[in-house]
């Protein structure tokens, strides 16, 4: 049985880890980095770049370089959060036929799971290169506050990448696993404050040890799936744009190239200000107008940055208060605070968290790697390699159905431990009603329309009866991934209807299968592209070598002998510019065949060989000697 890898599919960066013996290990990617930027680029040559290579070319290809796709996954195009991103992202966000938020690339619409699958494929390949064997199974993490549609979309991304997703686990829970696995005995209640690139979560987790078995029980969770480092970056970018407009009278928001340069510079400045008090944002030739080129040079202090983002940090503390109240705990009952996510490196975040909890956060957890490590531990648990660890997670949002008057009736309260199952009996609203529509909702509001609609289905064939008489039993079943299954049964006729919630949007199985086939086709195309590049390199090498020999010994050949060689060189050069690998290989062989006389001319002549042999005798000790240490006996 192969290894089950752990993947932290992040908004800004992703990370992969695996159990190496009895210890989790973060795996370096092909570039030698322990984290990979969650950036995907589609080039003019139809090549797909992922990670650092995609990030490097973003400035010259802003419309086809996609980042922060996790903020769109499982969302509707009309969602308020998506509409905010539409106006600031350099790439195109479009409405899919089913109303989901998709991305437009080179005139084609692409689903977020399809794009995220490219990052997962990179993580899969990174693990395979390290392990030296195929990887087909993974535990993938999601923000604790992800709803059902977002969890389903993440699982879809795994399928498209060729991975069987053995478990979806919440990021703060994974971080708690990473933190608590090697800690000493005793019970602890910890708060995991997870502020990543695009999402924020706060989970209260109790770690108990009984008879050598560690139990990680999530008491409550809360968060904001549209609050993270990207929002901090956007505050910096908007400040720089506004300052530049004041100074130069030019609005850079209409220039995608300039905005991409500003995004990189803004992120860099934000990171620098975690250790420095001041930084210079210097972007020469950022744009030009009738008066000539314009340069951006703006000083940014830590104090200014903090004033720009202070409300975002304060906003993160609201879910903290709710999670504590839901767990029935006070701040003083929290033993340790764990910071996860790159944005928690900001001093202001650390100060606010310390002030709120009245204790300094732990520094012994790597905020970029803890989540992937925890996912790898859970993979080890599922594979049977890690014993004595029990994980009890919760559903982040209440679940229910719409009942008469447009009210949401809750069946499963938020923060219920999963897996779980709950049934409740409902009835008809009208006399002789023969069918009921079960409208499944997720959220905390009383009015049905104010909650997230997860889908609906009909139960038909109800026997005619006065209103309130038929008994319709509705059952909610949430599995360990947090995925919801709903059934409705008429107790009078025993007729039953079941569905696994596929959000009223989301990808169909056919669409996912097509994307899997596309991904496999792309893998074949990538292999062919690699072979073509190798053939071109061989051709270039041969052309260069032949030209060099022609310049050195070409005068020893007749014009009749040289002409076919020069023609074969020209033919090979022309073929190497094309896309036909077989044609290049044919021309390579043709050049090798006509170059025989040139090779002979390049061989040392007998007299030269004799001279070389003579000189070789006198230098035999130099050529053949082995180095050995000579000790000086004085």
Curated annotation (Swiss-Prot):
UniProt keyword Iron, yes or no: no
Question: Which SUPFAM superfamilies has this protein been placed in?
Answer: Actin-like ATPase domain (SSF53067), Heat shock protein 70kD (HSP70), C-terminal subdomain (SSF100934), Heat shock protein 70kD (HSP70), peptide-binding domain (SSF100920)
Q: Tell me the superkingdom of the source.
A: Bacteria
What induces or represses expression of this protein, per its UniProt record?
A: By stress conditions e.g. heat shock.
Q: Which InterPro entries match?
A: ATPase_NBD, Chaperone_DnaK, Heat_shock_70_CS, HSP70_C_sf, HSP70_peptide-bd_sf, Hsp_70_fam
Record's CDD domains? Answer: ASKHA_NBD_HSP70_DnaK-like
Q: Which UniProt keywords apply?
A: ATP-binding, Chaperone, Nucleotide-binding, Phosphoprotein, Stress response
Does the UniProt entry include the keyword ATP-binding? yes
Q: Where does the record place the modification Phosphothreonine?
A: 199
Q: Which Pfam families match?
A: HSP70
The biased composition feature labelled Low complexity covers: 600-614
Q: Where is this region: Disordered?
A: 599-634
An annotated Gene Ontology molecular function: ATP binding
The protein's role, per its UniProt record:
Acts as a chaperone.
**Which family does the similarity line name?**
Belongs to the heat shock protein 70 family.
Q: What is this protein called?
A: Chaperone protein DnaK
Q: Which organism is it from?
A: Pasteurella multocida (strain Pm70)
Q: Which gene encodes it?
A: dnaK
């Amino acid at each position: 049985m192969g290894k089950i890898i752990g993947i932290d599919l992040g908004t800004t960066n992703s990370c992969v880890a695996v159990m190496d013996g009895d210890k989790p290990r973060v795996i370096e990617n092909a570039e030698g980095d322990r984290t990979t930027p969650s950036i995907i680029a589609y080039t003019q040559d139809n090549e797909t770049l992922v990670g650092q290579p995609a990030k490097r070319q973003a400035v010259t290809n802003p419309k086809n370089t996609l980042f922060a796709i996790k903020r769109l996954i499982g969302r509707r195009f009309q969602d308020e959060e998506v509409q905010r991103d539409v106006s600031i992202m350099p790439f195109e966000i479009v409405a899919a036929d089913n109303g989901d938020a998709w991305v437009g690339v080179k005139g084609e619409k692409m689903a977020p799971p399809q794009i995220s699958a490219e990052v997962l494929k990179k993580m899969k390949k990174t693990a395979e290169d390290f392990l030296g064997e195929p990887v087909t199974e993974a535990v993938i993490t999601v923000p604790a506050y992800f709803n059902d549609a977002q969890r389903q979309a993440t699982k879809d991304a795994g399928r498209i990448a060729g991975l069987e997703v053995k478990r979806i686990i919440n990021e703060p829970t994974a971080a708690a696993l990473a933190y608590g696995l090697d800690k000493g005995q005793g019970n602890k209640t910890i708060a995991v404050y997870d502020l990543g690139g695009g999402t924020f979560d706060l989970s209260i987790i109790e770690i108990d040890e009984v008879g050598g078995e560690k139990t990680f029980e999530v008491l409550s969770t809360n968060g904001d799936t549209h609050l993270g480092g990207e929002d901090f970056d956007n505050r910096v970018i908007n400040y720089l744009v506004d300052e530049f407009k004041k100074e130069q009278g030019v609005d850079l928001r209409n220039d995608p190239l300039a905005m991409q340069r500003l995004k990189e510079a803004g992120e860099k400045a934000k990171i620098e200000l975690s250790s420095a008090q001041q930084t210079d944002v210097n972007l020469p030739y950022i744009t030009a107008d009738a008066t000539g080129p314009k340069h951006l040079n703006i000083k940014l202090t830590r104090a200014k940055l903090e004033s720009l983002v202070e409300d975002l940090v304060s906003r993160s503390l609201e879910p903290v208060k709710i999670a504590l109240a839901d767990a029935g705990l006070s701040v003083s009952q929290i033993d340790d605070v764990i910071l996860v996510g790159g944005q928690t490196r900001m001093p202001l975040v650390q100060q606010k968290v310390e002030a709120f909890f009245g204790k300094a956060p732990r520094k012994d957890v790597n905020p970029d790697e803890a989540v992937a490590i925890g996912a790898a531990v859970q993979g080890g648990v599922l594979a049977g390699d890690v014993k004595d660890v029990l994980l009890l997670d919760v559903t982040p949002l209440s679940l229910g159905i719409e009942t008469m008057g447009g009210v949401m009736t809750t069946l499963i309260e938020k923060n219920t431990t999963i897996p779980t199952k709950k049934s409740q009996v409902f009835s008809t609203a009208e006399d002789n009603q023969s069918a009921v529509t079960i409208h499944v909702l997720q959220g905390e509001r009383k009015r049905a329309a104010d909650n997230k609609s997860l889908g609906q289905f009909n139960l038909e064939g109800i026997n005619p009866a006065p209103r309130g008489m038929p008994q319709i039993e509705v059952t909610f079943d949430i599995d360990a991934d947090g995925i919801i299954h709903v059934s409705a049964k008429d107790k009078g006729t025993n007729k039953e209807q079941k569905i696994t919630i596929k959000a009223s949007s989301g990808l169909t199985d056919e669409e996912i299968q097509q994307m899997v086939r596309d991904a496999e086709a792309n893998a074949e195309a990538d292999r062919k592209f690699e072979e073509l590049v190798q053939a071109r390199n061989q051709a270039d090498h041969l052309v260069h070598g032949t030209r060099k020999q022609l310049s050195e010994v070409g005068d020893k050949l007749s014009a009749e002998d040289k002409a076919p060689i020069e023609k074969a060189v020209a033919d090979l050069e022309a073929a190497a510019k094309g896309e036909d690998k077989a044609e290049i290989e044919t021309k390579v062989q043709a050049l090798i065949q006509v170059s025989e006389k040139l090779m002979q001319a390049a061989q040392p002549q007998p007299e030269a060989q004799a001279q070389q042999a003579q000189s070789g005798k006198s230098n035999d000790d130099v050529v053949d000697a082995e180095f050995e240490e000579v000790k000086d006996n004085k």
